[in-house]
């Protein structure tokens, strides 16, 4: 793969590209990376590349030098990327896609940015590495290059490690441990020491789910949404199997039994609910067992519900809010929503995607 970086400070990249894994990849011919100075295409005797923007403060990179720089190195197989907080977020999937390109051009902004006409004319896509502003786009370019390089065969000593790293399956990676078994009184989880590979795999998956749900709810709801046909269950301690009816039964510890029964009866439009057992309609065959525990600390449950269509989805959310529940984080497309009831039990509500 060939990568070219357009920047006002081409020397900025020298040290990172000589070091560590990227340096080895370049040395071994797996990557060819060159940084170029936009000032080489500046205007006039003084190679001017920036000017004051109309009706604004600061300085802006001019359209002509940027366009000339891009066209000078652009090929038929080139993909031009502008690093900007206005771009789409960098993800593992995007890194995989970029790793398949043969020639990438990274355009690094400086000052107040770049004249919009240059972007409209020459840029194929904009990528953001986060919701914050940097002193220059060079840092972002290095982040993207590092992320995509992991998916180029031969760059990593063990390509399998790239597939197992955090976020590659849509979830955060769980904790890792090495020797000694006990450090300052903290022990390595026993399951990792028993040699049961299936038990370890189950433990890692559960810890990964829990950590993602707690630390990155945005990733968690995206994970649930992207895996439409995969069952994602509540945590084991919150779920039991009904031997009589063979249905998924979830125990919800509540402060006020009457209040919670009224809330869920109205939410799911149940005409004659029993005192503490609510049968949720639909194909899920879920039964909620309400257990009154008063003001003591409750074990909160994590549940998911997929509705048949968009109208049902928004109707459900409207009822939830009207009845006193809280609406929390939504995914980027608004098709998945986290909600909570009076007692803090969390539901992931989504609807089926139209194929």
From Swiss-Prot:
It comes from Chlamydia caviae (strain ATCC VR-813 / DSM 19441 / 03DC25 / GPIC) (Chlamydophila caviae). The gene is trmD. Homodimer. Pfam families: tRNA_m1G_MT. Its EC number is 2.1.1.228. Specifically methylates guanosine-37 in various tRNAs. The keyword Methyltransferase applies. GO terms for biological process: tRNA N1-guanine methylation. One of its GO terms (molecular function) is tRNA (guanine(37)-N1)-methyltransferase activity. This is tRNA (guanine-N(1)-)-methyltransferase. GO terms for cellular component: cytosol. Signal peptide: none annotated. Keywords: Cytoplasm, Methyltransferase, S-adenosyl-L-methionine, Transferase, tRNA processing. Belongs to the RNA methyltransferase TrmD family.
């Amino acid at each position: 793969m060939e990568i070219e970086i357009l920047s006002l400070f081409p020397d900025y990249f020298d040290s990172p590209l000589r070091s560590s894994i990227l340096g080895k990849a370049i040395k071994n011919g797996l990557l060819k990376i060159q940084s170029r100075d936009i000032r080489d295409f500046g205007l006039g005797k003084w190679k001017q590349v920036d000017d004051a923007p109309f009706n604004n403060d600061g300085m802006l990179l001019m359209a002509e030098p940027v366009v000339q720089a891009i066209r000078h190195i652009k090929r038929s197989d080139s993909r031009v990327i502008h690093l900007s907080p206005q771009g789409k977020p960098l993800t593992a999937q995007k890194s995989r896609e970029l790793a398949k390109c043969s020639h990438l051009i990274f355009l690094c902004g400086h000052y107040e940015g770049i004249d919009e006409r240059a972007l409209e004319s020459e840029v194929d896509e904009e990528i953001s590495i986060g919701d914050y502003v940097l002193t220059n786009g060079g840092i972002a370019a290095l982040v993207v290059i590092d992320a995509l390089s992991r998916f180029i065969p031969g760059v990593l000593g063990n390509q399998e490690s790239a597939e197992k790293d955090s976020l590659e399956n849509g979830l955060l990676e769980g904790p890792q441990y090495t020797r000694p078994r006990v450090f300052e009184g903290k022990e390595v989880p026993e399951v990792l020491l028993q040699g049961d590979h299936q038990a370890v795999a189950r433990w890692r998956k559960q810890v990964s789910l829990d950590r993602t749900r707690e630390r990155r709810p945005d990733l968690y709801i995206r994970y649930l949404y992207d895996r439409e046909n995969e069952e994602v269950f509540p945590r084991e301690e919150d779920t039991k199997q009904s031997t009589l009816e063979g249905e998924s039964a979830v125990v919800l510890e509540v402060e006020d039994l009457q209040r919670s029964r009224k809330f869920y009866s109205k939410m799911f439009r149940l005409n004659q609910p029993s005192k503490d057992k609510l049968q949720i309609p639909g194909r899920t065959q879920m039964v909620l067992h309400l257990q009154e525990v008063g003001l003591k600390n409750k074990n909160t449950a994590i549940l998911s519900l997929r509705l048949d269509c968009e109208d049902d989805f928004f109707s459900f959310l409207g009822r939830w809010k009207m009845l006193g529940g809280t609406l929390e984080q939504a995914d980027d497309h608004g098709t998945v929503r986290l909600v909570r009831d009076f007692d803090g039990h969390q539901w992931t509500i989504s609807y089926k995607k139209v194929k």
